[in-house]
């Protein structure tokens, strides 16, 4: 039992998105837990979305995993004891490493893992396994924004300012972000600003916009270049800011100079007049923010698209100016902390580069090993999944906190690769679609049953507090990592199971890094301090560092203190419509579901609100395909077919259809999505794939999920 598990109520945070809304949980057993939003937490201020209100329901999911499962020779998963399950995993790992080398064992983590879990997972992979083959599902979420922000500012923090700054803004531009559905409590901070929304869909957020720009999917880069062109051509740039705080403007302008508004209109469909109006609104605002979301980022050129929006923000003098700025809306619950703590293919804790000799030496010293023993960078997430079971790819995969059988692009291929493994191990709270394929399934705790820390979208480190003991034989992921590490010959003390002890090591590992947590302690967090990283440990006689809620006010994180314009130019999406596939499909989230749906599809209230896959389509487009509202449709791309219920929407672009990606089985949107990768980040092109629609004969009609 933990130090807090005997309490009947705890202050903690929602288990879903990166807002990490403050909540208060009460109850003595899983079946009677209640949740209330906390008015004292500034991000949600007493607000909570439908998912947050229903989160306790998942604690008693009918198929909650309560015991380890192992697959018998006959093919069935059957209950087993922890020792037997971990022994089987360790035995297989040793065999595979002996026969194929350490990189034959891979690890895939998740952006919902606590900082402590993400940190220990990276250490486990690189030391206990000795593998370079580790990445996480944040590669499908924040990779583009992270790369662009690091290149421009020298460091990546989703929002380099508190969420509450948005409420005092005059104008906020949202590029590819439908926060009214994906982060509803954030909308209370967007009531005052005039909103500019860039989205091909007439989303719930776009409905509240003062100005809605609707580019064809895959053309954001041309639009952002055009907005920069307008700013320069109409004399709306902040020339003093550009001269005093940035470098590289001339090279960026060289590309934008060729994207005058009328040319942009031809490529994107956005009227030149609206382009000019958007720039006027931003430039005339006393305070303004530009924010990107997955709609701008999940492309084979996602990093360049975010860079183009950053260039616009820099030209207008927004980043590093109090009350204004640029930011990216982190999606997953710990998408920020998850990419800082070492579970990403090319990073070490503290947001250190795995190829930096000084960074390697620092982490090696903390871990008590030689820097030469640390593997180099491995494959990015999709490349890793695509290589599973191949001649030169991993033969074993350990999965914590994600469901790639549903969430990865070209999922038929991914499922085939998972099936080709010698060993698939999945730690989860429910039998997700990936867990159902596993050789060993390990039941782990969820948010109300564990301690730890989470870092939200504004870089604020938060305490997750335990209300209940785990049910059945469920254990923390930290116990899983310790159990496997010790069976592979590592000292038990090197893999603590107490989150507080892991955090103390994490503090030392992050010291001096870009994401410096060394001055943050559980004691300070429990005392109610609001601590945003970087928060370095002070010298012996200095007071505690207060944290850094606003970055870049004095300088940017590059050695010369200047932000960088990045020269980028538009290029088409990886595929464009043709006679066989005349439409563009784009994917995204809906209000009642979350990520792969493994959690929310098990909550009756949420499942009732969004029970099956659908394809949102203009009535004229549907009619040309022989479809009526409510008909079951085949959505066919060059990679495969998904089934979805036709949903008329007169506001849709006639050339574009939309599918949510939360559903499993034949309704998986990722059966059709394109795994074309951004060369800078490994981000797949989730937002653009060419398709055609076909009706499903009545004799074959049924639920698409």
Q: Where do the model's predicted regions map?
A:
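Extended redox/cofactor-interaction regions of prokaryotic respiratory oxidoreductases
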Residues: 119-191, 195-198, 205-207, 221-225, ...
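N-terminal leader/propeptide and maturation segments of large enzyme subunits in energy/redox metabolism
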Residues: 76-78, 234-272, 349-364, 369-372, ...
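Glycine/threonine-rich phosphate-binding loop and adjacent beta-strand/alpha-helix elements that clamp
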Residues: 163, 448-470, 481, 485-487
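Conserved short loop/turn motifs at secondary-structure junctions
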Residues: 106-113, 266-270, 293-300, 332, ...
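Long, contiguous, secondary-structure-rich segments that constitute the structural scaffold
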Residues: 470-531, 596, 600-616, 620-705
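Flexible, glycine/charged-enriched surface loops at secondary-structure junctions
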Residues: 101-104, 237-242, 289, 320-327, ...
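N-terminal export/assembly segments and adjacent metallocofactor-ligating motifs
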Residues: 1-234, 244, 248, 252, ...
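Flexible glycine/proline-enriched surface loops and loop-helix/loop-strand junctions
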Residues: 208-209, 259-261, 291-296, 461-469
């Amino acid at each position: 039992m933990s130090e807090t598990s005997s309490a009947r109520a705890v202050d903690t945070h929602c288990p879903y998105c990166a807002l990490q809304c403050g909540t208060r949980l009460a109850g003595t057993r899983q079946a009677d837990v209640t949740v209330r939003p906390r008015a004292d937490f500034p991000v949600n201020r007493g607000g909570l979305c439908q998912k947050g209100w229903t989160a306790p329901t998942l604690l008693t999911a009918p198929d909650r995993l309560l015991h380890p499962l192992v697959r018998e020779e006959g093919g069935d998963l059957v209950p087993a004891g922890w020792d037997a399950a971990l022994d089987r995993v360790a035995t297989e790992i040793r065999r595979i490493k002996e026969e194929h080398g350490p990189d034959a064992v891979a690890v895939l983590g998740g952006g919902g893992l606590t900082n402590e879990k993400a940190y220990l997972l990276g250490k486990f992979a690189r030391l206990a396994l000795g593998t370079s083959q580790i990445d996480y599902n944040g590669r499908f979420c924040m990779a583009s924004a992270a790369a662009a922000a690091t290149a421009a500012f020298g460091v990546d923090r989703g929002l380099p300012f508190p969420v509450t700054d948005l409420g005092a803004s005059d104008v906020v531009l949202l590029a590819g972000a439908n926060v009214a559905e994906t982060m509803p409590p954030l909308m209370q901070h967007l009531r005052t600003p005039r909103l500019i929304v860039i989205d091909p869909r007439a989303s719930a957020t776009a409905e509240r916009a003062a100005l809605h720009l609707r580019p064809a999917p895959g053309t954001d880069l041309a639009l952002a270049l055009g907005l920069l062109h307008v700013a320069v051509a109409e004399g709306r740039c902040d020339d003093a800011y550009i001269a005093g705080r940035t470098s590289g403007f001339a090279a960026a302008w060289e590309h934008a100079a060729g994207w005058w508004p009328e040319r942009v209109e031809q490529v994107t469909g956005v009227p030149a007049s609206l382009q000019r109006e958007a720039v006027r609104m931003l430039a005339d605002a006393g305070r303004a923010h530009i924010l990107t979301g997955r709609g701008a980022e999940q492309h084979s050129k996602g990093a360049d698209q975010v860079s183009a929006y950053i260039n616009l923000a820099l030209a207008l003098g927004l980043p590093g100016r109090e009350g204004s700025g640029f930011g990216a809306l982190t999606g997953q619950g710990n998408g920020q902390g998850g990419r800082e703590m070492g579970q990403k293919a090319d990073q070490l804790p503290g947001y250190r580069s795995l190829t930096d000799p000084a960074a390697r030496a620092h982490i090696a010293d903390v871990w008590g090993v030689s820097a030469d023993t640390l593997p180099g960078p491995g494959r990015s997430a999709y490349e890793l999944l695509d290589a599973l079971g191949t001649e030169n790819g991993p033969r074993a995969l350990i999965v914590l906190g994600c469901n790639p059988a549903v969430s990865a692009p070209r999922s038929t291929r991914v499922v085939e690769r998972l099936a080709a493994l010698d060993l698939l191990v999945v730690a989860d709270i429910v039998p997700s679609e990936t867990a159902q394929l596993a050789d060993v399934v390990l039941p782990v705790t969820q948010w109300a049953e564990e301690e730890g820390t989470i870092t939200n979208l504004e870089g604020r480190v938060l305490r997750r507090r335990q209300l209940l003991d785990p049910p059945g034989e469920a254990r923390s992921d930290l116990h899983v990592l310790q159990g496997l590490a010790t069976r592979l010959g590592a000292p038990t003390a090197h893999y603590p199971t107490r989150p507080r002890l892991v955090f103390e090591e994490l503090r030392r590992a992050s010291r001096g890094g870009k994401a410096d947590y060394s001055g943050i302690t559980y004691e300070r967090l429990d005392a109610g301090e609001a601590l945003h990283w970087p928060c370095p440990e002070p010298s012996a006689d200095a007071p505690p560092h207060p944290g850094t809620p606003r970055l870049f006010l004095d300088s940017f994180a590059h050695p010369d203190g200047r932000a960088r314009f990045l020269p980028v130019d538009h290029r088409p999406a990886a595929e464009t419509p043709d006679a066989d596939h005349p439409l563009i499909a784009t994917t995204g989230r809906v209000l009642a579901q979350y990520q792969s749906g493994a959690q929310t599809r098990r909550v009756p209230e949420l499942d009732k609100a969004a029970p099956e896959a659908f394809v949102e389509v203009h009535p004229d487009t549907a009619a040309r395909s022989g479809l009526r509202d409510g008909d079951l449709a085949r959505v066919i791309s060059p990679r495969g077919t998904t089934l979805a219920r036709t949903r008329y929407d007169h506001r849709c672009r006639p050339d574009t259809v939309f599918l949510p990606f939360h559903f499993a089985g034949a309704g998986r949107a990722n059966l059709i999505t394109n795994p074309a990768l951004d060369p800078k980040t490994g981000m797949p092109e989730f937002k653009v794939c060419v398709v055609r629609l076909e009706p499903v004969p009545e004799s074959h009609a049924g639920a698409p999920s």
